[in-house]
Each structure stands twice: as structure tokens, then as C-alpha cells.
Amino acid sequence: MPKVKLMIKQLDSNEKSVVELSERCFDELRQVYRLTELAVSYKNSTKSEWSCFGFHVDEVLVGVVEAKQVGSELQLSSLAVAPSFRQKGVARKLIDFVVTQFKHINSVSVWCVEQTGNVAVFKALGFNVVQRFDSDFFILSDGSKAVEVQLKQKVTA
């Protein structure tokens, strides 16, 4: 049986494979919610602050996440894992690797839309809910405000 080659590395978030994987994964979520104009504007204005990392299996991109350090907190955004690679440790390995790429991190923070069911995914990864509120960034498909949830995880040395 041939050995599978795994690799995680920093990428350009505009790279074609990153954009395609993100679009494919987030298309599923667009059945549940969509971004408001405010969210699109914010994402575009802060894009340069984020570093993008990708998880490759045999040179095929199967997971991505964006990260930025704010003080001693590492904030994660746009975590996406190809459907056929979910529940196989890709997100956990990606997050663990990204934490090692920044100095003096005490906690990792991630936001998600409650109605997607992703809160349970992050809880399974060791994150705890710290706040939830009606979002100005996301609207549910029925036109009501989505509930944004912030989850955090302590980082141990």
C-alpha cells in the first residue's frame, strides 16, 4: 500500500485551489445563511491581516483556514474541509499546526453561525462557547438574523 503524503503549509488565500475549496464547502452553508453587505465589506477590508494555511493529502488541497494574531489570541476564520475528508482529523491537525506558527498564543478563538450545526464540531475539537448574539454579518435564508457564536480554546505550552 503506497504511503500517503500529508503536508500543511501557508498559502495565498487568492490561490485557485483555496478559492475553489472554500467556495465548495461554503456553498453548503449558503443554504442556511448568507453574508450581509457589512460582512462582505469587513472581510474585504481586513483580508490582508489574515494568513491562510492549507492541508494537503498527496498534493491535493483538502482543508484551509485563515488565522490572525490579536494580542495573545489566535483568531481563526473560514475553516473549510472537503466533505470526503471530514471527521478524519484534518481540522484538528490544521488548527494544531497553525497555533505553532504564531508566538505567545494563550487562546484560539473561532466564530460560527449557530444554525449551521458547526458549534458541535468546534466543541468536539475542544472549544467552549464564550458568547452568542444576533449577527449583523449573517442573515438566515428566511430573512431573520443568524446567531453568531464565539468559541475559545486555551492553548497549553
Regions found by a protein language model. Give the residues of each.
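Conserved N-terminal entry element of GNAT/NAT acetyltransferase domains
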Residues: 1-16, 153-157
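Acetyl-CoA-dependent GNAT
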Residues: 10-78, 82, 95-97
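Conserved acetyl-CoA-binding loop-helix of GNAT-fold acetyltransferases
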Residues: 81, 87-100, 124
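Conserved active-site alpha-helix within GNAT-family acetyltransferase domains
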Residues: 92, 115-132, 140-141
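Conserved GNAT acetyl-CoA-binding A-motif
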Residues: 102-113
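Terminal substrate-recognition subdomain of acyl/acetyltransferases
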Residues: 110-111, 139-157
